[in-house]
Amino acid sequence: MDVLSLWKILYMWVVFIYDKNDLFFFFCVALFGGSLGTLSIVKALFLVNFKHLTVVTLLQKLQPIFAIILARLLLKEKLKRAYLFWGFLALLGGYFLTFEFNLPEVVEGDNLLAASLYSLLAAFSFGSATVFGKRVLKAASFRTALYVRYLMTTCVMFIIVALTCGFGDFSEATGGNWLIFVIIALTTGSGAILLYYFGLR
């Protein structure tokens, strides 16, 4: 059995087991958490040539703001009164972190503004994926949530890569690159996300 046939079997299993609402939230987790969030944060880091890491990484800390807002809207979870104050303070801190005490402006040759926007998009994507993941765990175990997330993320990323840059760059990756990819997948990838879903139950 080749890899493509295995993916088809897994896909049909997922479609057969879960209803349309569950599949929609699985897709949202894959689209935002697995694809857009990852692409956005990597794009942000490349825009600043891995400098200004403080700005890019600290703006990521705003993702709980988006998660809590969406949890209120989608999951109908109640917000404490103090949330509005701390949420506003976090957004204000994010602004000063990016622009200091200046108004936003685009400086030629400076990618910090674009990188900050990508970082905010990543924060929104990861934050929303937390909410969608919480909804998914009502219908699936944390292990199944991980497997289906990877399955759908692979499908989404396959389409994105096919429609944008193509697959030519795969041939340029060295053995060392693939080893690093595997290490990332097994540690901060699969291992971390499995613990994340375990705690999100």
Residue ranges and their predicted role:
Residues 44, 73-75, 79, 136, ...:
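Hydrophobic/aromatic residues within transmembrane alpha-helices
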